[in-house]
A protein has these predicted regions:
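N-terminal accessory segments
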Residues: 1-147, 166, 170-171, 209-211
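Long, contiguous hydrophobic alpha-helical segments, chiefly transmembrane helices and signal peptides
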Residues: 66, 129-134, 138-140, 155, ...
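C-terminal cap/substrate-recognition region of VAO/PCMH-type FAD-linked oxidoreductases
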Residues: 169-212
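Short, structured patches in soluble enzyme cores that scaffold and shape functional sites
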Residues: 81-83, 100, 123, 151, ...
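Internal, well-ordered domain-core segments that constitute the primary functional module
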Residues: 95, 142-169, 173, 179-182, ...
Length: 212
């Protein structure tokens, strides 16, 4: 069950705000509610409720959106994935997984301590993986290793069909390759809600890093 935050909840004002204060939230255009999702299944249920109710869902991972795509959603629902941080590995466990709710700093630390690898992502540790990776995932290691999406092997994504049914699926180069390609930086992640990113291999973490 999701954690549902309505306008009457004292947490609403804080959770409705974006980290980008340029889009601080106009009360007249604010979302009716926020649903905090801790699993992909909860996100699917929340999305299905929004579809059934005929309201516009917007999605937030870390809240660093450069544009006003999420916060001001009159009468709609914000699906907040910031608590969706499962490290569970599918199948034989040979893939690395980053959930949409992970902040980049959390992903870097977990990958380094467990496996000695990294992703060539951004340098702001509080940016959410959900938005960063679906946007391409550029960072300080990208001149050496490319974009984060260059390493992406599969994506766990929620989609809605033409009958309004929500489905959770895993897409890759063999299973729905067009949708997988769209998840790799195309369209700003607007083809569905990506809840998890799967990597067959990742580059080794740098031996040392200099801060200037």
């Amino acid at each position: 069950m999701t954690i549902k935050i309505t306008r009457s909840d004292p947490r609403y004002a804080m959770l409705q705000r974006s980290r980008n204060l340029r889009w601080d939230g106009n009360p007249a255009e604010a979302a009716a509610e926020i649903e905090l999702c801790e699993t992909a299944e909860q996100a699917a249920e929340a999305l299905q409720r929004a579809v059934n109710a005929g309201v516009r869902p917007t999605v937030r991972s870390g809240g660093h959106c450069y544009e006003d795509f999420v916060v001001n959603n009159p009468g709609g629902t914000i699906l907040d994935l910031s608590l969706l941080k499962s490290d569970a590995l599918p199948g034989d466990g040979k893939r690395y997984r980053i959930s949409a709710g992970h902040e980049l700093g959390e992903a870097y630390i977990s990958l380094y301590k467990r496996y000695g690898v990294t992703i060539p992502g951004g340098s702001c540790f509080e940016v959410g993986a959900g938005g960063h990776i679906t946007g391409g995932g550029f960072g300080v290691l990208s001149r050496l290793h490319g974009l984060t999406i260059d390493w992406l092997s599969a994506a766990e994504i929620l989609t809605v069909d033409n009958k309004g049914h929500v489905a959770l699926r895993i897409v890759d180069e063999k299973h729905e390759p067009d949708l997988f390609r769209a998840c790799r930086g195309g369209g700003g992640g607007n083809f569905g809600i990506v809840t998890g990113f799967l990597f067959d291999r990742l580059p080794a973490a740098p031996y040392e890093v200099a801060n200037a």
